[in-house]
C-alpha cells in the first residue's frame, strides 16, 4: 500500500502569479496527461516496486480534479496488480488539507509487514506475526552488506532526502569508474526501462480513469 498526501494545491495556486511550481505542474502542455499521478504517484509506484522487487502489471484508477478550473487531476485512488499475484493500492492527493509531504509505504505479507514514512525517514517499523513490533533505525544495529558505504553520518543524526540523490550520483560515478560491485549497483539504479515503465503506469492510470476505472494492462500502452 502506498499513500502520498500533499495539501499545497488545495486552492488554485497556479493562478496566483507567484507559484511557478504550481503553474507548470498543472499545465498539460508542460507536465503531460496526468497531474498528481504523474507528479507524486509516479514516485510512489516506483518506490513500491523498488522495495518489493515486483512490477506493476495492471491498474484500475479513479482520477479526480477537485479544484474548479484545474486542467489535471489533483487526487487519485488506484488499485494495482503486480506479478506473483500480489495486489495493492495507491492513495494520491495534492489537496489533502494539512498535509505537507506525507509519503508512506506499507508492505504486508503472510508472516510480517514493513512500514516506512518519508517524513520520518530514519525509522522503519517491522511487524512479525506473534512478536512485538520492531523499530529499525538507519545506521542502527541491523545492517546488511548493501548498507555499508551508504550511511554517511552516525545513527541518530537525521539523514534522508538530499542524501538519497547523492547516493544515486555516487553509485553512477562508481559504475563509470568501474569500481566495486558494478552489477549489484546497476540493479539498484533506475534506468531508461524504469522510466518507460513508470510512464506506462501513468498513462494506464489516465486511460483507466477515462474508461470508468476499467482494469488496464501496462503492456497495452
Would you name each region that the model predicts?
Residues 1, 207-221:
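C-terminal capping/lid region of NAD(P)-dependent oxidoreductase domains
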Residues 1-70, 124, 212:
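Predominantly a Rossmann-like dinucleotide-binding segment in NAD(P)-dependent oxidoreductases
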Residues 14-21, 25, 50, 58, ...:
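C-terminal glycine/acidic-rich active-site capping loop/insertion
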Residues 38-113, 118-122:
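Glycine-rich, aromatic-lined ligand/substrate-binding cores of catalytic
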Residues 44-45, 168-173, 202:
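A general structural signal for well-ordered alpha-helical segments in protein cores
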Residues 57, 88, 182-187, 211-217:
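Core catalytic loop region at the nicotinamide-binding pocket of NAD(P)H-dependent oxidoreductases
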Residues 198-205:
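Alpha-helical scaffold segments in carbohydrate-active enzymes
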Amino acid at each position: 500500500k502506498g499513500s502520498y498526501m500533499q495539501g499545497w494545491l488545495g486552492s488554485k495556486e497556479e493562478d496566483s502569479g507567484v507559484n511557478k511550481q504550481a503553474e507548470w505542474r498543472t499545465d498539460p502542455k508542460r507536465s503531460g496527461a496526468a497531474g498528481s499521478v504523474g507528479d507524486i504517484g509516479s514516485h510512489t509506484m516506483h518506490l513500491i516496486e523498488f522495495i518489493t522487487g515486483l512490477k506493476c502489471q495492471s491498474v484500475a484508477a479513479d482520477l479526480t480534479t477537485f479544484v474548479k478550473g484545474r486542467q489535471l487531476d489533483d487526487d487519485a485512488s488506484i488499485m494495482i496488480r503486480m506479478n506473483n499475484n500480489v495486489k495493492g493500492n495507491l492513495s494520491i492527493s495534492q489537496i489533502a488539507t494539512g498535509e505537507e509531504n506525507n509519503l508512506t509505504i506499507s508492505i504486508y505479507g503472510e508472516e510480517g509487514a514493513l512500514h516506512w514514512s518519508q517524513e520520518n525517514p530514519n525509522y522503519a517499523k517491522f511487524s512479525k506475526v506473534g512478536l512485538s513490533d520492531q523499530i529499525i533505525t538507519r545506521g542502527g544495529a541491523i545492517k546488511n552488506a548493501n548498507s555499508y558505504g551508504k550511511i554517511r553520518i552516525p545513527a541518530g543524526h537525521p539523514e534522508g532526502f538530499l542524501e538519497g540523490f547523492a547516493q544515486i550520483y555516487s553509485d553512477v560515478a562508481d559504475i563509470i569508474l568501474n569500481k566495486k560491485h558494478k552489477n549489484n549497483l546497476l540493479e539498484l539504479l533506475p534506468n531508461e526501462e524504469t522510466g518507460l515503465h513508470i510512464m506506462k503506469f501513468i498513462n494506464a492510470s489516465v486511460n483507466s480513469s477515462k474508461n470508468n476505472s476499467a482494469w488496464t494492462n501496462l503492456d497495452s500502452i
